[in-house]
């Protein structure tokens, strides 16, 4: 029975033929961002004419399953709907395989021969205007659909949610359509548990040869609750007008997916459009191989999930792939603000208004029928979510020999947060007229891990007029994308690279394989970072850049082929190293030139013959480290180095000769750099400055000779032509300035004289113009410099020069406002009374004469008597003061003594000089301010004094001993009980005393207490957990452990308590700066007793303690790092105590007040330190021993309640009245730390505690104690929690 169904609207595919027209205007040479902004994104985000919000969750689902309707198109209506339901049996055999077509579909699908296309095709029974719905939702098993080729419509909807669908097991399937006046769309939907594609699958193909009827559009929807998989041999082909919707947990397509495939001759004359929608795939979508285009300008779109992976992407030379990632948070629901309103309003004076606020008003009595179309909501482009990723292992383009003016462009466009191209890189197939590949991420980043190839060759080349072009654009819309290339890029001749981004990062770029390349980075708005750039005749369009190394080759073609930086480079551009490689000869020279810029900083510049550097259009160029020839030993060619304004930075070095061929058309500033003039043929080349020159110097001295650091050095000056003026520098105006004194000016005679002292002539490494003689070795060196063999062979004959500076009057110097020059007459010879000498200043010791090892870089002169000679300190060389003085920081010596004292000074001497040398000391103080030095020294001396202190070393033993003193006092209080509430015990004692006579006159209670045993079970075993801490300004120490003992009450001729104990505690210490950390294992053991004589109590105690300490020093600063080490030592103590007290009893002995006095002896000590450090400042020695004699006074209150419970408090003062001992100073190389101790200490102590009965014969006790040193302000705190068992 045929089932009729009310006509309803059927959505059409996103990329339908109507949309094709909108896309035709997009030529391959245009940016494919238009595909997003004008077609794809409005269609997805805004919905199309039906009013369906396709960019929303519900709208996208509707589009994914039924597709969006073509704009303003009357909906298709099926003439007839057939329905088939899988009946009994299909839901019973989950392992059975069925032929889907034979089992269910064949009864409602007809087939026949298409004479126009010479092929068989299939359609829904009754014609392509009908629909077949198959209800298999309860069916199980596997259903094969194989050989359903050329299915031309109408619609097919198969619901088999619990079953597996296998497409193409033995033969492929194709779902297509026939084009007619209605442009009818074929829609095929499969909903299964799993979908397996085993053979070819075609969508919207032409039937047969394709010469007959065209296809309209086809939508194939595959839904699988678990997964969709295709085999390696299963090729999926999407023809023009095809849409494939995939909805599943995961999609893995192992075979080739071909979008925009051709089927008939001539199809390449028009572009094709196809779409794959994977937005409803929750996991990763994996395309093993994706091909876009088939000799045609195919345009393909993938509506992507969060993560898309493509193994190999093949793009035809004019094809475009657009991968659209979902926005942050996915597609959201939009309110349905569009009514489905299509009827006409004919009521008099009635109006209708839709939700788009458009009001239609019908005039009175009008018979006109007005149809209100749905509102179309169109949103703009959006960025992919922050976790959206498109990964492509390799991109290939394919090309043929077609020639087109401007060439062809293939494109890949996405909006994902990250577009990653893997190790396979990018291959561009190039042909005549040129080919271009555009890779753009509209809103995110691009990363390329592999190489760029042309015709499968790294460094592949193209021909003139047929260039190969790579284009990468990151963050086109956001202007905040980063393009990163993690592999070296090698570009052959006529191969170009264009990158647009906010920031571009390159590992390396090599265009030196023949040149004629363009690197267009003008679209990078922030910074271009290149590790290594090799160029030859390359056009480099870049604004602000940071190039680690620039190597400029000559291309070997003709004169004038430069690497051209064709954009304004701005003011932030920098090149760490420039290397101009040697050209062949003048006709094959090359070079680099710049269009314009504010400033270029170059750290190192190495020039070579026949390679030019033209920076005349850059306002300022600064050389910060080195300016030299890369071929100084073989200067057979000439260079041409051209600048506008050039600055030689501080401590930079310029090697200059006639081969440099340096042109400065503006100003030259030598800002405390050094110019080395090389003598060639007896001459030096003149450095000509077009405008003004500034020679800025300082008061630093040369590290090797002790002279002022030269600003100009003439090497091999002995080869200069004699009796000739040698002009070193000429300018319209020359100014001089001393930055150390802050003076500068033009025509300043004093500054000119100072500058001349910084113009030095050398014979090898020996100064010619002045000799400083401190010993006979200096006499020999002077003789070698001036060519005086007598001074070399017989230095003793010239001892009169020792302690003097001798000036070579055969050399004269000129430094004025227009030139700097030297005039060489020949070397003069020193004589004993010939003058031309200046006495060197001295100090109180002869050590001042031997300064060579202390003359470290940047050390300025400190004595005005010889401003051109070596500095002589007021302090002995080899002292830390001399290093400060040479560093022109004499005031810091006073700061050091004022803030750190002699101990801090001695420690600095030990750390920097005694353990290293003056050179190391100079390096360290140059890097550290005076305030920081004193701060670090104070930290170190405080820590070292703490280490040496015997109080610190025995602190944990004292805390452990204090814990035990509290426990022992608690035991004595417990056993000294006179009060009982136990009536049974009292009655038993009375019975035992029956018929006894006593001589005493005390009360009955006193008699009972005196002659009664303290307990029925007088022997006790006890154990306590203990914890303690030592608190002071230098740090915090903590201790935890356990203590145990046994005691008993003895009732013989003498009434007494005797006991013994042992304890263990682990202690740790950290000072406030965390530079000292310690851990120690400690033991304590001893005996105690109390003797009773009526209300008199005599206490005696003896104990010993031993601790093994492991400590480490951990200073963070570089200045103190040599102190860092681990070390160990032993600490020990021994003590005896005796005291007397008298009990005052109240409330029938329940409350007892006991004052007491006592004396004690303590012996404290430690062994030498043993360090694991191999540095010269390893800790050693440090043993200490101290004997202490103390007197104490205490008051104790006890309260007894019940039969066993009690509480007590004890407070008192302990005063040392004598001490003596010895200590071995802690040694760190030459630095000593002597232990210091307060003469006589006073301690205050308070402790309290008590005991509760838990069960018969089992008791719980606890207590706390605090001891405070009133002199050193150190506190010790301890507590215990313990158990006692009585037996």
Curated annotation (Swiss-Prot):
Q: Where are the transmembrane segments?
A: none
**GO MF annotation list:** toxin activity
Give residue ranges for domain Autotransporter: 1014-1287
Question: Region annotation Disordered: residue ranges?
Answer: 326-381
Q: Which Gene Ontology cellular-component terms appear in the entry?
A: cell outer membrane; cell surface; extracellular region; periplasmic space
Q: Which keywords, in A-to-Z order, does the entry hold?
A: Cell outer membrane, Membrane, Periplasm, Secreted, Signal, Toxin, Transmembrane, Transmembrane beta strand, Virulence
**Which residue intervals are annotated with compositional bias (Polar residues) in the record?**
351-376
Note the InterPro entries from the entry: Autotransporte_beta, Autotransporte_beta_dom_sf, OM_autotransptr_brl_dom, Vacuolating_cytotoxin
Q: Where in the sequence is the signal peptide annotated?
A: 1-33
Domain statement: The signal peptide, cleaved at the inner membrane, guides the autotransporter protein to the periplasmic space. Then, insertion of the C-terminal translocator domain in the outer membrane forms a hydrophilic pore for the translocation of the passenger domain to the bacterial cell surface, with subsequent cleavage.
- Role description: Induces vacuolation of eukaryotic cells. Causes ulceration and gastric lesions.
What is this protein identified as? Vacuolating cytotoxin autotransporter
Species per Swiss-Prot/TrEMBL record: Helicobacter pylori (Campylobacter pylori)
